[in-house]
Amino acid sequence: MMATQTLSIDSYPDGQQMQVVTELKTEQDPNCSEPDVEGVSPPPVGSQTPMDADKQAIYRHPLFPLLALLFEKCEQSTQGSEGTTSASFDVDIENFVRKQEKEGKPFFCEDPETDNLMVKAIQVLRIHLLELEKVNELCKDFCSRYIACLKTKMNSETLLSGEPGSPYSPVQSQQIQSAITGTLSPQGIVVPASALQQGNVTMATVAGGTVYQPVTVVTPQGQVVTQALSPGTIRIQNSQLQLQLNQDLSILHQDDGSSKNKRGVLPKHATNVMRSWLFQHIGHPYPTEDEKKQIAAQTNLTLLQVNNWFINARRRILQPMLDSSCSETPKTKKKTAQNRPVQRFWPDSIASGAAQPAASELTVSEGAVVTITAPVSMNVDSLQSLSSDGATLAVQQVMMAEQSEDDSVDSTGDGGAALAPGHLGGLVLENSDSLQ
């Protein structure tokens, strides 16, 4: 794009408004007459067209310099970031009006149609200039907001990342702490030379709160410079200084503490309290809401943290314990089941004659005979009467328990005396009226 030159009202004096049209006609038509000394060549009357006549009327109009100036400002607004403001065009309009009044020139011509066209063209360019100004302001506002957002994000990332150069990094905190600790030495204060250039006042305190000299300054090159301060010029309490020091150190280490809390690792004291409650109530490890509140008050945790811990503990602590106990001692459970109180499943009339300490046989309805090698002690007081189905189930359980213990023993017996079905020791379980 060709660079446009800044135009002003004086760029279009009288007698030169038709120069552009003349030059264009000269390039297109070599037979056209050369321009005169003033740069205006009157075209032949017979060769003019209606369009050429309209162009000449526009170029000769008194408002044409103002229209050209406004068009130039619109082009300048679109070419660079620093656009032309509408206020500057208002000043140009005032200057144009003063010049026209000073020279006694009219603002309009004899053709009302041309006057209306020029006024509307100036209004359109004026609106266009205002819109360009708004767009320029929006662009500047967006750029400023975007840059501010980037700066904020970069600063926050620098603080959170804990880089060595950031002021809140652990290395920087240790350096600050050591530097502050060094300032409390009775021999003097060791500070960088840049601190004095910034106008910072550094002081050394000893017991009593009085400032004493000397003040030792160490330059970055390692040179030691001593500066004297008169005793008693500044007084400060050691307690206040120590309190301020503790506050500064707590602020510096605040990020470390917050990061530890964000990890989700509960304090050891809290886990010990909740673990103790869990094993004390292992039979029913489900705390009530009141118990949760009490535990939360003891451990300084929230109800949500306490609830989540117990959910995880039941799944990760108690469940593996139960699984391991079930897999290691399967036979122990069978033996402990026999130690339960023996429940009799036949009437008292049969049990009174069946309680004999001898080997006996149990005859089932199918006719199968099973020999019980170990005598079973019976207590008449604990006998209970049930249906034949319950008795059959109890007999099957006893048979299975005895068979698992004596797998190597033959069920027919080695020389054992088998009792007759009608013997009192043989218990015949039938669906009779006495069992109901």
Swiss-Prot record:
Q: List the disulfide bonds.
A: none
DNA-binding residue intervals: 259-321
GO CC annotation: what is one?
A: nucleus
Q: Which UniProt keywords apply?
A: Activator, DNA-binding, Homeobox, Nucleus, Phosphoprotein, Transcription, Transcription regulation
User: Which GO annotations describe the biological process of this protein?
Assistant: angiogenesis; camera-type eye development; erythrocyte differentiation; positive regulation of transcription by RNA polymerase II; T cell differentiation
| MEIS N-terminal domain residues | 80-163
Q: Which residues get modified to Phosphoserine?
A: S33, S41
Is Repressor set as a keyword in this record? no
UniProt keyword annotation of Metal-binding present:
no
Q: Which domain of life is it from?
A: Eukaryota
- Region Disordered, as annotated, extends over 24-49, 401-436
Recorded GO molecular functions are:
chromatin binding; DNA-binding transcription factor activity, RNA polymerase II-specific; RNA polymerase II cis-regulatory region sequence-specific DNA binding
> Signal sequence: where?
none
The record's subcellular location field reads:
Nucleus
Q: Identify its protein family.
A: Belongs to the TALE/MEIS homeobox family.
> Which purpose does this protein serve, as stated in its record?
Activates transcription in the presence of PBX1A and HOXA1.
Q: How does it assemble?
A: Interacts with MN1.
UniProt protein name: Homeobox protein PKNOX1
Native source organism of the sequence: Bos taurus
